[in-house]
Amino acid sequence: MKIAVLLVIVLTSALAFAQETSELAIPPNGDAERAEVSQWIGPVKISIAYHSPRVHNPATNDRTGHIWGELVHYGFVDEGFGLTQSAPWRAGANESTTITLSDDVKVDGKDLKAGTYALFLDLEKTGPSFWIFSRHQGWGSFQYDPKYDVLRVPTNSQDAPFTEFLTYGFDERRPDSATAFLRWEKKRFSLKIDVPNVSELYVAKIRQQLESWPGFRYEDWQTAAQFCADNKINLDEALIWADKAISGPFRGASVGHEDFSTLQTKAAVLDAMGREADADVVMQKAFTLPDANAVQIYIYAMHVLRSGKKDKAMRIFVLKQQKHPDDLTRICGCRTLARNLTTTSELALGSTDIDGCGPESGESLPYL
């Protein structure tokens, strides 16, 4: 009798394996369709590949209430086939569920190297369950061996809306983190993934890209420098990138492109480095360029104003009016000044005619 049962298990497993490894276009075993979901966290790509069984299986009908603890076993069990005598659930159906990470991440606060791992779930009846990251070369749980485990992290089941097909996804997305989850029937299991050095990873990829085709465009050098300035990282190299955008050779040209925009980026890098005086020198040059239009100067003045430097912003607004007295952004500039004039000296200055922005233009600044 034992021999007969073992033979059935072997034949069933062999048939399933043959179906899943065949290159023929045939339905998957057990109607568990292959599925894959990917999510980017900054420059890091995370992909989960799995087979998705359903609650209402065509062969066994409604399995609601019989998934967790029955179809999905608690703890570790002997699969009755393969090399292992004690294995967790494969967190899906048929082949092993796998998770692929393009870069190093943290999972539940623990380090996990880039690569592809088999993803198992140790379902516990009481207390936390555990996600297990292990080698991915096995099939299902049949070749599971704990000596190849790379990481185990706890997870608690949560009640969730009914989900017919076992589904992986991502939510709670942030620029440097996301939560992966498994949902099936009325349960959800989560997995927090963090990329703590996301800005540094961006810089590394940008640096690599600038050695290729993007390095032929001054705009990409400028974008790279601006990213570093905005995030206050890699500033010494960012200053080199900003200079290349201004004066570097591109596509046979002898110099880059010196205009208001590229000079403003260089000034932003210098400002992030704490070199405000040097940044001001660069912007003085930018203001004198023929292409320095009223909108560009106005936007820059607003940026300075938002940084809390009211006096400096006021001087830039005045400069804009001197350079472009007939520009339609005049009223916007006047109103912006008025809303931000708070001290007695500022009110005194605002009540005068600032190149067409005062009472003579119908804009009584202190009262707007």
Language-model segments: residues:
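Boundary at the C-terminal end of the N-terminal hydrophobic targeting segment
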Residues: A16-E20
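Extended, well-structured beta-strand/loop surface patches
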Residues: A49-A114, F120-D220
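Alpha-helical adaptor scaffolds
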Residues: E219-P325, T329, G333
